[in-house]
């Protein structure tokens, strides 16, 4: 019997459940690339009996669909956690280390201990849990896809919320990404306190 797309997304988790793993955690990040704002990470343990239809890599979903799925994932999850690392720390330790730190914090803040962690991309250094890295995991793993939605929506909401503090920069429109408009604003006004200075060296004379 051919699996549906939703069932295919759970194939990795199904194999792990059959191997005896109970609490399977997916973890993913949002906001590696922007010129401003924190990097976010989410960790989530989903319930096998409550598969949510339509879960995909967050980048393939409309904002409206992401928002709807965000609420469903929170409601149906066994446990979830969201963490962020701000722009100052990103500048201090670099974006790769900041991303790993956000992921590690999200996992460690879960209300339960996962039996195994599925990571999108590469293994998290010094993580005290069994983990498997899955390249393009947000396209292959249901748990990672759920985490990608939680991370993306959480970051977008945060950026929209703080945008009122920095009205000149129009963060609510571009979410901190390096759009033409954002770069023109940067060249006119310079960076604000939430910009990642280490990301701006090729854009501004810093």
From Swiss-Prot:
Cofactor(s) needed for function: Mn(2+); Mg(2+)
Pfam families xref list: RNase_HII
RNase H type-2 domain location: 22-206
SUPFAM superfamilies: Ribonuclease H-like
Keywords: Cytoplasm, Endonuclease, Hydrolase, Manganese, Metal-binding, Nuclease
Record carries keyword Glycosyltransferase: no
Coiled coil: none
InterPro entries linked: RNase_HII, RNase_HII/HIII, RNase_HII/HIII_dom, RNaseH-like_sf, RNaseH_sf
EC number assigned by the record: 3.1.26.4
Molecular function GO terms recorded: manganese ion binding; RNA binding; RNA-DNA hybrid ribonuclease activity
Keyword Cell inner membrane in annotation: no
BP terms from Gene Ontology: DNA replication, removal of RNA primer; mismatch repair
Binding-site list for a divalent metal cation: 28-29, 120
Catalytic reactions on record: Endonucleolytic cleavage to 5'-phosphomonoester
Family to which this protein belongs: Belongs to the RNase HII family.
PANTHER family, alphabetized: RIBONUCLEASE H2 SUBUNIT A, RIBONUCLEASE HII
Protein name, as recorded: Ribonuclease HII
Protein's gene: rnhB
